Amino acid sequence: MPRCEQVALQSLFDNDSDLYLAFRDACIEQFVHDFQLAAALLVAQQDRAAFSRLAHSLKGVLNTLGHTEISPLAHALQLEAERADWPELQRLWLELRARMVAAFGLDALA
């Protein structure tokens, strides 16, 4: 378990590793759906509010999982979604997605 996750386990989950791992697994399952939603939103380039909500949710989940080194990217994505600069939004999304794939061992094609 990465150090950042150990910190979250201790500080937010009271060292309950079963609870933390169950939460982490559920989040990883949801990330696949989040990736699909983000891809659809980027193609449509219409729903800034939905992209902002997605980024906000990811920011919170990443913080809760202990990945405070990645969550600022989700926050930047949330702010960019409010401006709807779609090329910058796509750039930030691809960066965040790549960091999440690496951090959680996700399938890069999902």
Residue positions per predicted region:
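Two-component system phosphorelay core
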Residues: 1-110
